[in-house]
């Protein structure tokens, strides 16, 4: 019930911070602050379930960017904990038969990278399971626009062994997120026509990021889904997690389908392989999710974690924006639902 969910969240948000937590938050901030005045930090959730590494929890828990001062850091930690009990997080666990008592959450406080460019890299091709390819998707500013699928990012395919750039797709990136220097808040900026169509990463950056992806996979021992950010001449890896969709993608790729005759009216990126058909339902925002019935084709500008309950009913998913590494793509692959994005 919504009332119970709200009570649990409120209890987390209002709980007294014990001295240990307050000290840990301050120590983390002091460590990051060394040599800087009141640094901005990112407070990131990291959720996992015992013995269930095949689920991504993509977008289910909260992350807070551009947080400043220890009191606000402690508050953000509270809110990360409380995000275990949002309606969408509870639904995700129920639908996947998770024991709520065996789901855990860690909270990471890290330096906030005021990024000029950012995005996502996969150490294998997530749409085909080609283990010899690294996929990089990038946009200008903060990486939120790429991760959420709010823009169609540049896409780079790199050979994992030679680091040769095999393919580049430069898309029209309509806007970027950036930090307002006066308020410290994340703002949206519409890009000029020329900037929107400009290649985000140069060749040196692409190769540097690809090498980082390969190194991460070797360190963890399995394919990784990572987020990166660049500032100055440095590349930062801000998070990584195991790729959770290999088995379902392999099954879909192995299936053979007859080619459908007819005029091609739209094209996009194959984010999750397969074929699906059904009644097309266009969803303009989360308030319209009740439109979706079992077996429909869900069409939207983009998806977010609140769409998961509707996505699970869909026979196929199409979005205007996004790349092969965005939320819609990851969740579609996890559910085994055919999806085209961008």
Where in this protein do the model-derived segments appear?
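Structural motif
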Residues: 40-42, 106-107, 119, 132-134, ...
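N-terminal beta-alpha lobe that positions the nucleotide/phosphoryl donor
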Residues: 1-106, 196-204, 217, 261-266, ...
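Feature captures the catalytic cores and cofactor-binding loops of soluble hydro-lyases/lyases
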Residues: 282-342
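Extended active-site and interfacial segments that coordinate phosphate-rich ligands
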Residues: 57-91, 115-182, 238-269, 313-321, ...
């Amino acid at each position: 019930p919504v009332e119970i969910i709200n009570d649990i969240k409120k209890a987390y948000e209002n709980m007294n911070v014990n001295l240990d937590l307050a000290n840990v938050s301050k120590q983390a901030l002091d460590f990051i602050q060394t040599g800087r005045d009141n640094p901005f930090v990112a407070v990131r959730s990291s959720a996992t379930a015992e013995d269930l590494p095949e689920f991504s929890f993509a977008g289910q828990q909260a992350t807070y960017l551009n947080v400043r001062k220890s009191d606000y850091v402690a508050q953000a930690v509270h809110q990360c904990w409380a995000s275990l009990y949002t309606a969408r997080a509870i639904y995700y666990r129920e639908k996947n038969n998770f024991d709520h008592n065996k789901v855990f959450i860690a909270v990471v406080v890290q330096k906030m990278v005021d990024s000029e460019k950012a995005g996502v890299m996969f150490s294998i091709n997530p749409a085909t399971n080609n283990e010899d390819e690294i996929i990089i998707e990038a946009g200008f500013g903060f990486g939120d626009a790429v991760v959420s699928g709010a823009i169609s990012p540049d896409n780079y395919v790199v050979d994992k062994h030679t680091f040769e750039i095999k393919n580049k797709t430069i898309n029209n990136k309509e806007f970027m997120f950036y930090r307002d220097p006066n308020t410290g808040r994340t703002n949206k900026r519409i890009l000029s026509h020329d900037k929107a169509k400009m290649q985000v990463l140069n060749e040196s950056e692409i190769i540097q990021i690809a090498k980082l992806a390969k190194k991460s996979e070797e360190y963890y021992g399995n394919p990784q889904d990572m987020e990166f950010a660049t500032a100055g001449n440095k590349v930062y890896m801000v998070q990584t997690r195991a790729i959770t969709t290999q088995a379902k993608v392999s099954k879909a790729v192995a299936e053979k389908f007859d080619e459908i005759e007819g005029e091609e009216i739209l094209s996009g990126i194959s984010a999750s392989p397969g074929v699906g058909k059904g009644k097309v339902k266009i969803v303009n925002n989360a308030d319209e999710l009740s439109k979706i019935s079992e077996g429909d084709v869900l069409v939207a500008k983009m998806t977010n974690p609140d769409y998961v309950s509707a996505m699970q009913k869909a026979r196929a998913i199409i979005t205007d924006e996004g790349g092969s590494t965005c939320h819609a793509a990851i969740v579609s692959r996890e559910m085994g639902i055919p999806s085209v994005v961008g």
